[in-house]
Amino acid sequence: VDRAVPPKLFALNEAVIEKQDSGHTVRLQVWIDGAPFTSYAADGLILATPTGSTAYSMSARGPVLSPRLRAVLLTPVSPHMLFDRSLVIDPSELVEVEVIGHRSATLSIDGQPITTLSMGDRVTVGPAHHVARFVRFGDRRFHQILKAKFGLADR
């Protein structure tokens, strides 16, 4: 990884590792808590917080998570493989993602491009020691907000 990138970065919504070349996939190996999980051939991989589950991850067919839930959501972007589902894991489990193919990728955090990743570069995602606190106006609950934003009706 680029040496100018700080060793620790924080994301409110997501970290995304995406292909750089149009028309090609990127190959990414994923470890969960030090154990190999799988390798993805995909346009990218989204590692989202519950807050970020309603952003890019949702548009990639990932689930919507309650913001009260503590979890990390792994959502592949246009995967070229049989296992094409999102995975919800405990935030205490470290997730490592390594670029294993010869095609490079871009690391973005909360929509901001951070650096280019090449074969052998790894990104580690784990829980922050800081908890985000949000200001709420009114007495609206998460499920009420979802209903309003997506036009969901009572039946």
PLM regions and their residue ranges:
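Catalytic phosphate-donor-binding core of small-molecule kinases
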Residues: 1-46, 54-155
